[in-house]
Amino acid sequence: DSPIKAAVDNGDELSSKLIFDAAKEGDFFAPYADMLKAGYGTLAYGDAWNIFDNIVVSENLAKGSTGKLKLQQAPGSKFYGNIFKQLYMVQKEGQYKGYPLRTYVGNNFQGGYSDHFPVYIYIGK
């Protein structure tokens, strides 16, 4: 029985019924739920942040026993989910200052990376 049940970049909001129901049933744990409640996000739209990318893990991985693989908090963080957000990935000026620096806006090349920041987790013993 593998401790990792699902790891996805499903391009779906954390609040979506699919993710919410899976986490609610107790088989899965959505480590980004607390981050969203605290105002963090991977994608900004209409001056509101949302968690658009998710890594969903099994409850076994989230609550692993001593000596087993277990979901870990990042050093210095109170969250189990992490958002990779570096200065070079952030729009530095204009209306979308602080948003992810996009590759394209419409048909115009911006030279950025994506319209959302990537996510990652730590797994250890």
Where are these regions (language model features)?
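Metal-dependent phosphoester-hydrolase catalytic domains
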Residues: D1-K125
